[in-house]
Amino acid sequence: MAQATPYSYTERKRIRKSFGKRENVLGVPYLLTMQKDSYVAFLQKDVPPQKRKPEGLQAAFLSAFPIVSHNGFVEMKYIEFNMAKPAFDTRECQQRGLTYAAAVRAKLQMIIYDRETSTSQSKVVKEIKEQEVYMGEVPLMTDYGSFIVNGTERVIVSQLHRSPGVFFEHDKGKTHSSGKLLFSARIIPYRGSWLDFEFDPKDILYFRVDRRRKMPVTILLKAIGLNPEQILANFFVFDNFRLMDSGAQMEFVADRLRGEIARFDLTDKAGAVIVEKDKRITARHTRALEASGTSFISVPEDFLVGRVLAKNMVDADTGEIIAKANDELTDSLLKKLRTAGIKDIQCLYTNELDMGAYISQTLASDETADELAARVAIYRMMRPGEPPTEDAVQALFNRLFYSEDTYDLSRVGRMKFNARVGRDTAEGRMVLANDDILDVVKILVELRNGRGEVDDIDHLGNRRVRCVGELAENQYRSGLARIEKAVKERLGQAETEALMPHDLINSKPISAALKEFFGASQLSQFMDQTNPLSEITHKRRVSALGPGGLTRERAGFEVRDVHPTHYGRVCPIETPEGPNIGLINSLALYAQLNEYGFLETPYRRVIDSKVTDQIDYLSAIEEGKYVIAQANAGLDKDGKLIDELVSARESGESVLTSPERIQYMDVAPTQIVSVAASLVPFLEHDDANRALMGANMQRQAVPVLRPEKAFVGTGVERVSAVDSGTVVTAKRGGVVDYIDTNRIVIRVNDAETVAGEVGVDIYNLIKYQRSNQNTNIHQRPIVQRGDQVGAGDVIADGASTDIGELALGQNMLVAFMPWNGYNFEDSILISERVVADDRYTSIHIEELVVMARDTKLGSEEITRDIPNLSEQQLGRLDESGIVYIGAEVNPGDVLVGKVTPKGETTLTPEEKLLRAIFGEKASDVKDTSLRVDQGTNGTVIDVQVFTREGIQRDKRAQQIIDDELKRFRLDLNDQLRIVEADAFDRIEKLLAGKTANGGPNKLAKGTPIDKAYLASVDKYHWFDIRPADDDIANQLESIKNSLEQTRHSFDLAFEEKRKKLTQGDELPAGVLKMVKVYLAVKRRLQPGDKMAGRHGNKGVVSKIVPVEDMPYMADGTPCDIVLNPLGVPSRMNVGQVLEVHLGWAAKGIGQRIGDLLQQEAKIADVRKFLDELYNKSGGKSEGLNGLSDAEITEMATNLAQGVPFATPVFDGATEEEIRAMMHLAYPDEIAAAKGLNATRTQATLHDGRTGDAFERPVTVGYMHVLKLHHLVDDKMHARSTGPYSLVTQQPLGGKAQFGGQRFGEMEVWALEAYGASYVLQEMLTVKSDDVNGRTKVYESIVKGEHAIEAGMPESFNVLVKEIRSLGIDIELERN
C-alpha cells in the first residue's frame, strides 16, 4: 500500500481540487483551543500538586488561605488539593440527568499556637491537625469543550470585557453646551473600587470612588500624604522673583517669554529697551536678552499682583506664616512680605495655552486642612451618616485601594497600568501605590494642557477575553470567600472544643456558587447542537454581554462597530442580526489568546522585503507598531516582495508603501474571518449584509438523511468537521480488526503502544442520539476490515459530514428563471423527485418523559393495567406497561401506562354491588398515561427506565440493564481477544527454534521447539513450556503476568459497570420511577419549510412540482429547483452565481470521470485525466503519483458523483479558471447535447408542461442548498377549543400553550369596515371570553342547533374590578 502520500486515509478517498494560490504556511489551528486550554489551566488536574502554578483553582485556594482566627492563636493552612475520578462518564450523565463533575478535596492543616509561650513576633506551635476536606464538585469539560449540567450539554461563552488598568478619555464635547472637551481618567481594578478623575466645565479636577459623590482631587492627594506645597511642586514649574523697594525683578527664562505680549518695556542689564510695551516678544528678542547677559528682568509691582505663591511664606524672626502656598499675591500681602524682610518669592508659572492653573484652582476650592481631614472627608462620602472615628477612617481608606483582600489590579491590570503611565516594567504590586495615583493625575492634567492622546476603549488592546477557566475561578473564589468568613468566626472555638478542619468547613457555598454559574449564568448557554458547525461556532463565541459586561440597552454604536483591531482577531461578518448585533462576535480562524487574555493573530516575519517562515503572534497593541502587508501581496519564488508599492496596514490605516518598509505579512487570506464565514465560497463577491446572513444560516442547517459534500467548498470543511468532534477519528494508528454498525475495533501499531497499555482501541459509535435541538446525532463507519489507518484519520462519519468533510445540505440543479409566480418574493420551487429521493428528509428525535410520583393519596404506578382502555390501545405495551422499541406510533397513542390514585368518591348502589361481586378496585385510579402529542408520528427508538433506590425494578428495566452489560462484555472480550492474539504471536516468535528444558505433551529436555509442536499444544499451555534460556523464560513469564493483569483489570471494569447499572438512580424528590421514551420522527420537505444557500439567499418552499412539469434540458435532465433571478441583483450576493457555475463544472467533470470508469478505460487514462484536472488547471497541484492504482480507482468512483472544488475565501477561483473548468467538463459534443451556449454558462431549457423551449437561455448549475431548522411542522398549529387564561378567560396564545389566533385591534377595524357585526360579536364574545356563551354554543353545536346567545365578556368584568380597585364604584343596570 503506497503509504508515503501526504494524504490521510480519508483524504485519499476524495481529494478536493483547490484553487488557492497561496502556499499554506500555517495550518488552521485546533478550533477549540481557547475553551480547552483555559479549563485545563483552571483545573491543573494532571499536574503534581507541588508543580502547580498559582492560577485557577490553586490561585483561589491560595487567596482564601491561610485563615487566622480573630485572636491570632489558631490558623487554617492550605497544603494542596486533588480531584477524584468522576462517578459517571458523559454518556451516563446525559442519560441520568446528572452533572459531569469531579469532587475536589483539599488537604488542610489546622495549627493551634500555645497561648502562654507565644508572642506576637514568635509563635510556638501547640498542635497541628491535618485532614482532607471535601470542597464541592467542579464540573468537568468534555473532550469537545462543553459541559454536562443536569444531563444537558451547555457551553460557557467567553466574555469580552474592559481590561483592568487605567483609561483616559473625553466626553467628545457632549456634556457641556459650549462643546468643551472634558477629560477624565478611570482606574479599573480586576476587583475592588473604581477610581475616577474628571474635569468639570470650570476646569476644576474632581475624583470619585465607585461613581459616588465627586470631590476635589486635592483631597485625595492630601489623603495620600502630600501637603499643598508638595502638590504644587508636583504639577507646576515656578517663576522666581526678587522683591525690590519698588517693583521687583523676575528671573529670565527665554522659553516662558517667547510668544507673550510685553505688558511693559523690557530692558536689558544696561537699561536699553529691547521690547516696547504691547509688542509680541519673539525669538530674536530673547536671543538679544541672552546675549546681553541678562539674568533678571525688572518688572513693575502690578505684574506680581494676582500671581499665586508656590510655597508657604514664613517670618524668619517670629516663625509666623504670613502667606500659605496657593495664596494669591495682593498689594497688602506684598507690603507684609517687605515688612518681614522677605526678598525671594516663588510663584506658579501658568499660561492659557499649555500650562493651565487647574490644580491650583482645585486646591483653592478644597477646604480640608491636612491628611486626616482629607481622609475623614472621603469616609463621609463613602459612609454617609456614620461617625468617623480615627481608626475607622484609616481602615476604610486602606481597604479602598491598599488592601490585597479587597483590591486587586491583577497581572493584566498592572501591566496595562505601567505601560500607560510610561514605566518600563510589566511587574509590580497588585494594589495601588501613591505614585500610581499621582502619575494618573499628572497625565490627566497634561491631556488637559493639550499634550498626549486619549485612549480608544473599543481598541482590542483595551478589551480582554475572560474564558471559562477564569469565570469558573471567580465563582470558586466567591464561594471560598463565604467559607472563609464562616471559618474565621468559628476558629476560636477550635482550640477549646478540639474540632477538626472538616467540622469547620461546610462546602455548600462553593457548590451553590458553581451550580448557579454553570446552571443559570448569562454566559452559560444551552449548546446549539443543530449541526457540527453550530457547535463549533457556539464554543468560539465571544460575548460583550453578561455579568460585569455591557447591557444591550446601554451599548451604543461604537462598541458594536467593526474596529481596525478586529483584523484577524474577531470576525467582522459573523454576528447576530437584531438587538445583539456587534455585541456577540465570533473568533477569527487563526486567533488565539495570550497570557494576559488579549487576542493575538499570527503574522509572517518579513526581513529586507523577503518573507521568512518565522511566525509571530501579535496582540492589537503590538500590531500598531508595525507595517503589515496583506496575504495577497505578490511574491517571487524566493519569497521576495515584487510589487513597487505593496498594500499594507499601518496603525489601523490602509496604506500603499514600498516593500522595504514592510515588517510582517498576513499568514493566510482567511485570517480575518470566522469558521462559519470561511465556509462561504466566493465570500469576496457577496455584499457584507448577505454574507452575515449566509454565515448565520449555515448554523441552522438541519442534518439530512444522506449528507452530500458541497461541490463548491472552501477547504475548511474537513478541519471544521474533525475539530467539532462529530466524526470519529483514530486515536492511534493501526489496522481495522472488526467493524459493524455500532463499533469499530482497531489493532494498534506496535510503534504506537506504550508498555503496559492495551494495544486495542474500541470506538463505540453514537446511534440515533437526540441533540439539544432534537436533531439526530448518528455515526456511520467509513472504513473496511483490514484497512490501515493513521492517528487522526477519520474512521466514521457523523451528522452532516460526508467522508470526513462538513456537508450541511445537498447539491441541487438550479435554474434561475421565473415559473408561474411560484418563485415570487424569494419563494422556492422544488421538484417532486427531490422529495421522492429523500434528499431533504431529516430525522428528529423527541424525548417524552413520564414520572411516577408519591402523592398524598398513595403512589402512582406504571402498569399495563389501565382502566377503560381496549386491548387494541394497549397493543404496543409490554407487560410492564412500556411501549416496545420499534413500535410506530400516532397522535394519542399510549406510550407508557400510568395510573394515579384519586380521592374516594361516593359510589352509587349499582357500583357498590359490582364492587362487592368483582372486588373491582379499578375505579379508585385515573388514567394519567404518557401519550403521543398532537401532530407527532414516529417510531420508538429507545426507552430508558430509572428506578429509585429501594424500589423493585420491573422486567423491562432489568432487561435494559442486561442488554447494556452484554454490550460492555462484548467490548471487553474483543479487547481481550486482540491482546491475547498479540501476546501469542509474540510468544510464537520468542519460542520458535529455541531449545526447551521440558514442557507439555512430554516435551523432552534439549528438544528444539518448532511451529508444529506449538500448533499441537493448546495456546494457554504454552506458558508451561520451560525454555533452556533464562532470558527467554523471564520474557515468557512477564507476558503471562501482563495477560493475567489485563484479564483482572477487565473483570474489575465489568464489576464496576455492573455496580453502576444496578444501584438505584438519583431522581428528583418525590419521584419513584421515571421512564424516558425516544421517538424518531421523519420530516420530509414540504411547502412552508425554509431553505437557503450559503450567500444569504433564503426562501420558503412554495410548491412541490411533479418531475415531468419541471423545466428540462435538451438531453432531458430536469431541474431540481427553480429560483427567482430577481433575488440576485438587488441583494448583491453574486457569489451564488459563481458557485452555480463552478458547481455545474464540478458535476460535468464528475460525469466524464464516471464515463471513463464505465467504459473500463485504462488506469493510465484515468490518471491522465485526473492529472489534467488537478495539476494543469490553476490552483494548488496535488501529488497523485503516490497513490496506488486501487486508490486511484476508488477515488475516481467517489469523484464520479461530482468533483469537489475548494475556492478559499479571498483567494478563490478566478473567472478564467471557472471558464476553463466549464470547457473541461463540457466538450463541444456534450455541450451541444445539453443545449449549452458557447460559454457553457447557460442552457436552452424546455417547459415540462408543453415541451416548448423557453425563449431565452437560462443560467443553470449546481448550488449547495440547505434546509433550515424552521420547519413548517413545528410552526403549523390549529385549535378548536383549548386552555383559557385564568383572569381574562381569553384563549392562551402560541403553539406551546395550544393557544388561539389573536384577533387584534386592527382586525376588529377590518370587520367594522365591512359592517360584519355578527361575526364581530362572535369574535369578541363566544369565541373568546364569554364563559357561559361559549358553553352554550358548544352545546347547541352538539345538538345540531345554530343559535348563538352572546353574554357578557369576562374582560369587561375585569375592567369593572380594576375601576373598583381605584375606589370608583360601578353598578350595571339590567334592562
From Swiss-Prot:
Entry EC no(s): 2.7.7.6
GO CC aspect terms: DNA-directed RNA polymerase complex
Xref: Pfam families: RNA_pol_Rpb2_1, RNA_pol_Rpb2_2, RNA_pol_Rpb2_3, RNA_pol_Rpb2_45, RNA_pol_Rpb2_6, RNA_pol_Rpb2_7
GO molecular function: DNA binding; DNA-directed RNA polymerase activity; ribonucleoside binding
Reactions catalysed, as given in the entry: RNA(n) + a ribonucleoside 5'-triphosphate = RNA(n+1) + diphosphate
Alphabetized InterPro entries for the sequence: DNA-dir_RNA_pol_bsu_ext_1_sf, DNA-dir_RNA_pol_bsu_external_1, DNA-dir_RNA_pol_su2, DNA-dir_RNAP_su2_dom, DNA-dir_RNAP_su2_hyb_sf, RNA_pol_bsu_bac, RNA_pol_bsu_CS, RNA_pol_bsu_protrusion
BP GO annotations: DNA-templated transcription
Domain of life of the source: Bacteria
Keywords recorded for this protein, A-Z: DNA-directed RNA polymerase, Nucleotidyltransferase, Transcription, Transferase
Keyword Transferase: yes
Residue pairs linked by disulfide bridges in the UniProt entry: none
EC category name: transferase
Gene3D superfamilies hit by this protein: 2.40.50.100, 2.40.50.150, 3.90.1100.10, DNA-directed RNA polymerase, beta subunit, external 1 domain, DNA-directed RNA polymerase, subunit 2, domain 6, RNA polymerase alpha subunit dimerisation domain, RNA polymerase Rpb2, domain 2
Quaternary structure note: The RNAP catalytic core consists of 2 alpha, 1 beta, 1 beta' and 1 omega subunit. When a sigma factor is associated with the core the holoenzyme is formed, which can initiate transcription.
Function: DNA-dependent RNA polymerase catalyzes the transcription of DNA into RNA using the four ribonucleoside triphosphates as substrates.
Protein family according to the UniProt entry: Belongs to the RNA polymerase beta chain family.
Name of this protein: DNA-directed RNA polymerase subunit beta
Organism, as annotated: Methylibium petroleiphilum (strain ATCC BAA-1232 / LMG 22953 / PM1)
Gene: rpoB
